[in-house]
């Protein structure tokens, strides 16, 4: 469970770790009940909802030994989500002006307003996504490195969505991502030693370099009678380049299997553009809170947790972010069926609406403690209490004492 502006958000998921697509339709082959098993593939099904306002469903498949001979990885995923209109402080006509002024350096204005109905089923944004990926283990610099290429397509469908730059129409996002990663940890749930490293670049085609449109003078005035038509044309195919770096290191503070472990983490992300007048309104960073992906006060954003702060309070449409964590873990139970550990942490991070303001040393800090539990067929669950030391941003309360619920493994 998590918490959004419209109440409790529930999530349910199933994960089959020894799935066999080959045995799915075979008779008399290896099964666990009705589940075909034996090939080490992973099938995941999940859903999130808070009832009326938000629903999301996803299905993913992973084959770590694609072809059966070499450790080549094949992945496929499909997802659908729908968010209906809510009364949100972050989406008002003042917000359009503030956000649009940010895009082109024209100043800023207040983003707070309460003028919309709390719920309207005729206002919505829908997202449909599909992706295919292929990865390969590398032999250099060592065999712990892997490289993955993934093709992704997302279609955004908006109707009467008066909380955004575009209220009606369809937007398309086709991108190719390249990911270099290395993992030397001894296990997934409670690593004692080793590190995880990831560097990725995702890029769309640079449509604005050849389509001949004058983006400087296209959809640059929200109050214009032709704004929505121009915005649909401007963002029919969105463009960007997105850079990610993530690193975690684990150090055992003892020689026994059940010993404390110190985890350190540093990560950052940057969302760039090819044309300063066509910055992507999608794929931005939603920073603060528990970091649960999916339902946020925004949509089509990458959710970054920062414990001790309200969800999205650091940034709801940031173009760069950084985060650092120092976390001490202590095992309470490490069994095959169920594992539990307690933790205490110091954390800091921030997000910026301009890449030029990016500064990893400019941090909003927090501290706290929590617990994690790993359950079969369910995965990772957790709860944290944290205190954000920067309680206010201007007059808005963003930090202080916070409880956060965690679902799913995070890197």
Regions found by a protein language model. Give the residues of each.
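Gram-negative/organellar outer-membrane beta-barrel architecture
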Residues: 1-190, 196, 386-411
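C-terminal outer-membrane beta-barrel translocator/porin domains of Gram-negative envelope proteins
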Residues: 1-6, 15, 159-332, 337, ...
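Short Gly/Pro-enriched loop/turn and capping motifs at secondary-structure junctions
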Residues: 83, 333, 349-351, 376-378, ...
């Amino acid at each position: 469970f998590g918490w959004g502006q419209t109440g409790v958000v529930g999530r349910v998921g199933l994960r089959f770790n020894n799935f066999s697509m080959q045995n799915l339709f075979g008779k008399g082959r290896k099964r666990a009940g009705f589940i075909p098993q034996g090939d080490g593939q992973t099938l995941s099904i999940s859903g999130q909802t808070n009832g009326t306002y938000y629903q999301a469903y996803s299905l993913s498949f992973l084959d770590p030994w694609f072809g059966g001979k070499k450790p080549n990885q094949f992945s496929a995923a499909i997802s659908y989500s729908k968010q209906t209109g809510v009364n949100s402080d972050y989406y008002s006509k003042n917000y359009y002006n503030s956000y649009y002024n940010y895009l082109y350096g024209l100043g800023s204005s207040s983003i707070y307003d309460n003028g919309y109905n709390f719920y309207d089923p005729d206002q919505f944004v829908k997202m449909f996504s599909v992706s295919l990926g292929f990865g390969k283990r590398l032999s250099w610099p060592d065999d712990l490195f892997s490289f993955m290429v993934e093709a992704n397509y997302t279609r955004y469908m908006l109707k009467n969505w008066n909380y955004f730059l575009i209220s009606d129409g369809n937007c398309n996002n086709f991108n190719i991502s390249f990911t270099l990663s290395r993992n030397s940890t001894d296990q997934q749930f409670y690593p004692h030693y080793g590190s995880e490293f990831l560097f990725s670049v995702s890029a769309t085609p640079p449509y604005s370099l050849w389509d001949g449109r004058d983006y400087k003078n296209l959809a640059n005035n929200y109050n214009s009678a032709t704004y929505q038509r121009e915005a649909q044309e401007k963002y029919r195919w969105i463009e960007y380049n997105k850079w990610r770096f993530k690193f975690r290191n684990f150090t055992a503070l003892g020689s026994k299997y059940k010993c404390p472990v110190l985890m350190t983490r540093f990560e950052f992300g940057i969302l760039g553009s090819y044309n300063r007048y066509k910055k992507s309104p999608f794929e931005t960073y939603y920073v603060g809170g528990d970091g649960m992906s999916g339902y946020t006060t925004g949509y089509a954003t990458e959710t970054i947790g920062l414990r001790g702060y309200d969800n999205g309070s650091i940034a709801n449409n940031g173009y760069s972010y950084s985060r650092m964590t120092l976390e001490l873990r202590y095992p309470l139970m490490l069994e095959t069926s169920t594992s539990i550990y307690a933790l205490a942490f110091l954390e800091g991070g921030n997000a910026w609406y301009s890449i030029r303001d990016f500064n990893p040393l400019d941090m909003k800090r927090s501290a706290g403690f929590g617990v994690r539990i790993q359950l079969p067929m369910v995965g990772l669950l957790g709860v944290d209490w944290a205190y954000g030391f920067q309680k206010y941003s201007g007059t808005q309360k963003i930090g202080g004492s916070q409880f956060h619920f965690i679902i799913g493994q995070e890197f």
